[in-house]
Amino acid sequence: MASLSKKDLEYRHESNAVSLINMHFVFIPKRRKAVWVGKIAERLQEIIFEVVTENRWKIIALEIMPHHVHLLVNVKPTDSASFVMQRVKSRASSYLRKEFPELLKLPTLWTPSYFVGSVGNVSTETVRKYIEEQRDK
């Protein structure tokens, strides 16, 4: 993962607001199964990038682990954490279950819960490093 750039810490200018809203999400598949491996993990990453681009969000860090996903993303001030998760999880579930029939064995792809924490610009680099280090554990 690339290091945090100065652009990641810049304020977002929208028509009615100036903001710097970085959210750290952790979300897991149903029953915490080791689902995110190989081609499935690669495709999940592509889907997340598509959703982020379509919604004009910015990925700061993304790590897809076999049992969970870390996503550090800059969002618009009009988008809530629940909206971000709904977009990511629903698109991923729909596409992945069509493209990988083995995932149909799971009653649902995601747990309904997730973790989200807001990240200030001072600690964003720390959170990004933490996410990257998860791969080595």
State what each model feature region is:
Residues 1-137:
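Basic nucleic-acid-binding interfaces
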